[in-house]
Amino acid sequence: MTTELNQGEQFVADFRANAAALTTANAYNPEDEHDACGVGFIAAIDGKPRRSVVEKGIEALKAVWHRGAVDADGKTGDGAGIHVAVPQKFFKDHVKVIGHRAPDNKLAVGQVFLPRISLDAQEACRCIVETEILAFGYYIYGWRQVPINVDIIGEKANATRPEIEQIIVGNNKGVSDEQFELDLYIIRRRIEKAVKGEQINDFYICSLSARSIIYKGMFLAEQLTTFYPDLLDERFESDFAIYHQRYSTNTFPTWPLAQPFRMLAHNGEINTVKGNVNWMKAHETRMEHPAFGTHMQDLKPVIGVGLSDSGSLDTVFEVMVRAGRTAPMVKMMLVPQALTSSQTTPDNHKALIQYCNSVMEPWDGPAALAMTDGRWVVGGMDRNGLRPMRYTITTDGLIIGGSETGMVKIDETQVIEKGRLGPGEMIAVDLQSGKLYRDRELKDHLATLKPWDKWVQNTTHLDELVKTASLKGEPSDMDKAELRRRQQAFGLTMEDMELILHPMVEDGKEAIGSMGDDSPIAVLSDKYRGLHHFFRQNFSQVTNPPIDSLRERRVMSLKTRLGNLGNILDEDETQTRLLQLESPVLTTAEFRAMRDYMGDTAAEIDATFPVDGGPEALRDALRRIRQETEDAVRGGATHVILTDEAMGPARAAIPAILATGAVHTHLIRSNLRTFTSLNVRTAEGLDTHYFAVLIGVGATTVNAYLAQEAIAERHRRGLFGSMPLEKGMANYKKAIDDGLLKIMSKMGISVISSYRGGGNFEAIGLSRALVAEHFPAMVSRISGIGLNGIQKKVLEQHATAYNEEVVALPVGGFYRFRKSGDRHGWEGGVIHTLQQAVTNDSYTTFKKYSEQVNKRPPMQLRDLLELRSTKAPVPVDEVESITAIRKRFITPGMSMGALSPEAHGTLNVAMNRIGAKSDSGEGGEDPARFRPDKNGDNWNSAIKQVASGRFGVTAEYLNQCRELEIKVAQGAKPGEGGQLPGFKVTEMIARLRHSTPGVMLISPPPHHDIYSIEDLAQLIYDLKQINPDAKVTVKLVSRSGIGTIAAGVAKANADIILISGNSGGTGASPQTSIKFAGLPWEMGLSEVHQVLTLNRLRHRVRLRTDGGLKTGRDIVIAAMLGAEEFGIGTASLIAMGCIMVRQCHSNTCPVGVCVQDDKLRQKFVGTPEKVVNLFTFLAEEVREILAGLGFRSLNEVIGRTDLLHQVSRGAEHLDDLDLNPRLAQVDPGENARYCTLQGRNEVPDTLDARIVADARPLFEEGEKMQLAYNARNTQRAIGTRLSSMVTRKFGMFGLQPGHITIRLRGTAGQSLGAFAVQGIKLEVMGDANDYVGKGLSGGTIVVRPTTSSPLETNKNTIIGNTVLYGATAGKLFAAGQAGERFAVRNSGATVVVEGCGSNGCEYMTGGTAVILGRVGDNFAAGMTGGMAYVYDLDDSLPLYINDESVIFQRIEVGHYESQLKHLIEEHVTETQSRFAAEILNDWAREVTKFWQVVPKEMLNRLEVPVHLPKAISAE
């Protein structure tokens, strides 16, 4: 008999079947899942349990529902839960009811998820649990069925719901509470291993403790107490509560992944988790502690399979607590404050942080943490302060902390403090002593626990030694002939020397390039490519942010520790007996000095192999170096040196990356890696990508000796002018260091110790077996060449170097087309044919172009695929029309700034003529374009881009489009920001970007309002409020794991997801980013389509792709891999006249396409007709291909990878590739393989729905109005929909200021007043959350405490993080402090606040900021416009300011004093701030305490000079 499944059960069955098929096909990895959330804690400061703590914890959890995600069924959440003390009375009463006498001491309770479907498995699990508890001699009172209400959860959640029971355990042995907890921890770990040994799934212990218990599951936050009625019982009392609402990137309901975990709840993402997990494998082999005794092996592996990043952090946190450290100390060890962050860090704190960094690699990434070990309750923040953590302290002795303020309703008269945690900070309650510790006091307490300052003196700092050696002179030992041979052996060219090496030596910076990478990926190239070419850099997007390695250098570190790392569970002075360097990059003199210092503690390993050693020579050599290294370490070597110096005619170098990966992995598997450092001397290294790969696979230090010999040889030839050789070497080292920081920062990683060995790359074209053996931290989705293939290539190249009499370096052609070099997609003949076709409107010529592209040897993965169909061809006339197909085309985001105004406008006109869409790119759009010309031509971009710089993003701009695109990343430089040099910022561009002509503009690497997936959901929400008609696109760049990110984006209510390939164009980018970051769109697109289909989300979103599409064949293949829409960027530029000279970044484009120079712009010959011809030809070719395959529309082939198959191209290295993972099919069930949603994915209404209805007299009669409402933190983007209506009815500046006033009482949710326009005034009596005044476009916002509040405004936080991001006009007055990144990228708003957190006024380009109080670290970083005034009572600003781009001085000019005073007066009028009024009351004295902060680039542009001679530097 078959039982019919309900929808939830059917989804679960389909998901499991499809996921298994994809996993088998190597197309999907469940470990790619990400999550984010709302998190918080409540604690009774006196440590006494109260019912109110539980009630307020539940209330707070229900108030962060919008930070989680909800399934389409409206009932299945991504997970929510609460962690409280075990209510002893509740469980002792239960013990009595079941016939036992309740003990006097504490009961322990295990909250257990048991398998529900298999009763045999369920009983087996109970048996294991009981056996392990009894083995430790503890008494079991019995099992308790936890009462639950299954009616309120969704069918999907119910289909995966476990059986939920509690086991009640007595401490009949009478051991101490600490010993009982330790035993219960060991028992739980033994149970987990035993259940796993029985291969039973769906078993999980939420908690097993006498101190605390966790109730969690896959329901919505507001359903917690309905699902678990236990929590409504008055006997449920606690001294703390930790709560969590989860947002996951997949839709499969997994109950154990709900948080809180056993000791912590985490909002954010650990960017370094791959490296941390790898290093824990290395550390745990040495982990011993008396507390665990003989049970140590029961606790390993510490990090189990399938854990999330938060779960992994929790397991490490737990083992370190159980080994005797307190929760605050473990937080310091795992997620430490940045040691380099501030000159204001006390010395005792610095010693503590240095100790922590010596013992552990930091777990780095956005993290708001709520933690408990049963005694301590701790709130903590990551080193960058990338998540919000607000707290409130009340008169009745409660502290309430969490992701938002206002989660719990508190009478303002009972609030004694409102604060926030800044970067690296903590706040904690010691429940045992009943004491609250703020950050400084807590770290002072930790600093007294051990003599950290003495211990850290054991570390030997080598820098002085190695730098002294370098200053004495850099050796140059190699003759020119040997230099040339070695360069040739590694495939180096003149292009490498001149285009890559020379700028690094001359300027200390990486080489910059432009346009995209149109050369073949390494495995498809017929030229020799070093092994580093097979590794593509990973980067952050959406689920965690990249960081700015230039402007936020203070939180980053290349500090490198060398030696024996010891046992991380110890706490003694031996752990700091290490060597330390400031950077892992060493010149030859430095390396030799370090080697001499190491003496007998170092062992050198020859990393070469005989050229005549037979087909297994390389494999044998790898076996040898692994064994020699193991023997050396077992023999006591604490430093290993791998070197290829022995190469010569008879011996070839093992690629250093392969040697390093092999040795690093072998040492981990042999339990030896933490005993030694792994130092590499290689002739192969040249650019920053190479160093990053080498360190990423495990190298401790690197010396690229051949690069140094090349520099010396070029220096002898006088190619660096009068520059001393040592200066050139120092510049090269600086360029590599800065490049490493940039590559780390793309992943959001701040510390190289957490990057090392993390394998933050994807291998493209290397065999899975090779990668699994030597680079197990990486993925290789499409396989490729193995050791034999590598050996063959290495020996062929080696022969060209050593079998010839004289060796001259080849010219090259990897970066720019050369006849003797690598093939390029846009060769001269191809460009010429395409331009001929569009100029002459000749489809015949276009077909010749298409044949040129399609018939050449493979260059891209799609070139290895052929189309196939079993259907009979149909007449072309029956296929969907050219007009319909053309509407699927897009010209991708190219800004006015990158493009000339003529080129930008031509694309817009052309795309509008054919009903397609052009993308404005970053940088705003001229309002003159918003209305068609007299001849009907429409110069307006149909897609408006919202990028990280938010240049020109106003309410008007956002309302003049059909689509809004959030550019998270760019194909040519994912994980990076950008900058428009001053010489490109013309009068027109400055006007559009709300900046100053001639002044450089910086786009940050991340969106400062997208640090996680729920932040993206909030931005999408904001954009759908400001434009109620436009669809929202999210632009991602292809990388492994992008499928799960896209699933999260779809759940965030995006309408379109754009997958950009690595070969897309750019106006300017580091060459190593263009060449080595991101993946081909074929890989990302197919993965996204597969995972969206797997999660039953595909029919809700449209998929778009771009990045090197050239022909109709490319478009059809893209459709079969899942795309519905297609971006054609470079080809459209070529149609307008681009000839690919790759000078976009230098403002010298000879054909007027990518240039702002007036004379060169006149050379532009592009026309809308040429662009229209291109898209017409592409559409016609698509029709012909579809007809030949027997299909009548593109929709019929979308997602039909069965119509593609991989074909042999007759080359062994190509046939090793396996594209089948990209062609794997997912059964879509009842849904289509493409988007069937009409309209857009709508978001819930905000308070504005009521406001707009109540404001009818304004819109109908133009009446001046005042409206009043109560506000809650769940009401987001208040005023934004109103702004949209005002903009559309009256224009952005059509109303007088204050025409409509909205008065709010309470706590405003995120994005208060986002994009508010002139005429709107928002007054809040209470406080507000993050993103206040985002994109403010002329409106006024006032935030002040209620009149009944006893708080001193200047000492309390009133608004959140990232205030006035991208604001272009308007005013903000806040009577209190702002959070981190206050006024980031402010372009024109005026603001007065009473203090701010770190990174204030970062990237500011306009407007005026007055800060009546202390600022945080790194103030004014990257500030190039506007002005700031800082009230400084203790002359501390010089310690906090980043003065690279600004000067600061006391106010010397009456004009500026008057401006400042007027703004403070206005602030007092609006907020009634007593503190600001006191400043005005003694103005003559108080004005002397202000600093005036002015960007250097603005000094000669100010109408009123600031008396520069008085300016001082932070130094």
UniProtKB/Swiss-Prot annotation:
Record bears the keyword Iron-sulfur: yes
Binding site for [3Fe-4S] cluster: 1138, 1144, 1149
Region described as Disordered: spans on this chain: 916-937
Residues that coordinate or bind FMN: 1085-1142
Propeptide stretches in the record: 1-36
Catalytic activity, as annotated: 2 L-glutamate + NADP(+) = L-glutamine + 2-oxoglutarate + NADPH + H(+)
A molecular-function term among this protein's GO annotations: metal ion binding
Enzyme nomenclature, EC number: 1.4.1.13
SUPFAM superfamilies the UniProt entry points to: Alpha subunit of glutamate synthase, C-terminal domain, FMN-linked oxidoreductases, N-terminal nucleophile aminohydrolases (Ntn hydrolases)
Active site feature: 37
GO biological process: ammonia assimilation cycle; L-glutamate biosynthetic process
Segments forming domain Glutamine amidotransferase type-2: 37-432
Broadest EC class assigned to this enzyme: oxidoreductase
Cofactor annotation remark: Binds 1 [3Fe-4S] cluster.
Pathway: Amino-acid biosynthesis; L-glutamate biosynthesis via GLT pathway; L-glutamate from 2-oxoglutarate and L-glutamine (NADP(+) route): step 1/1; Energy metabolism; nitrogen metabolism
Subunit annotation: Aggregate of 4 catalytic active heterodimers, consisting of a large and a small subunit.
Family statement: Belongs to the glutamate synthase family.
PANTHER family noted in UniProt: FAD NADPH DEHYDROGENASE/OXIDOREDUCTASE (PTHR11938), GLUTAMATE SYNTHASE (NADH) (PTHR11938:SF133)
Further comment: Glutamine binds to the large subunit and transfers the amido group to 2-oxo-glutamate that apparently binds to the small subunit.
Protein name per Swiss-Prot or TrEMBL: Glutamate synthase [NADPH] large chain
Species this chain originates from: Azospirillum brasilense
